[in-house]
């Protein structure tokens, strides 16, 4: 499956499960353009609500993307934060890497 088809499938899945105002950001080698065929798909899910994420949020928002990866025979690795949690990580290298190389693929 071609890269754009995979991104389209990820967007379609996100559209079916994500709450309004949330964002899905592709980062890592797939975003930088240096991915190999066996490279995974790193996704940051930013939920548009305050507070903290929990197991129910992972099951509701991240798990459908993991399942999509299984169906497409690719590895999709979603990381889930609320906007509030994400802003608290502004001092981390991870935050800066995602801000620098990340591509918003759904909002």
Predicted region positions:
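Catalytic core of pol beta-like nucleotidyltransferases
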Residues: 1-25, 31-37, 48-107
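Short beta-strand->loop micro-motif that forms the acidic, two-metal-ion catalytic signature
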Residues: 41-46
């Amino acid at each position: 499956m071609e890269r754009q088809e995979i991104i389209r499938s990820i967007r379609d899945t996100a559209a079916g499960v994500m709450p309004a105002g949330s964002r899905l950001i592709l980062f890592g080698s797939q975003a930088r353009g240096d991915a190999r065929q066996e490279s995974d798909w790193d996704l940051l899910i930013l939920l548009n609500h305050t507070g903290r994420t929990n197991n129910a949020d992972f099951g509701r928002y991240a798990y459908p993307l993991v399942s999509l990866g299984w169906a497409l025979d690719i590895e999709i690795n979603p990381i889930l934060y609320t906007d509030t949690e994400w802003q608290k990580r502004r001092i981390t290298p991870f935050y800066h890497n995602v801000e620098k190389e990340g591509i918003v693929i759904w909002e």
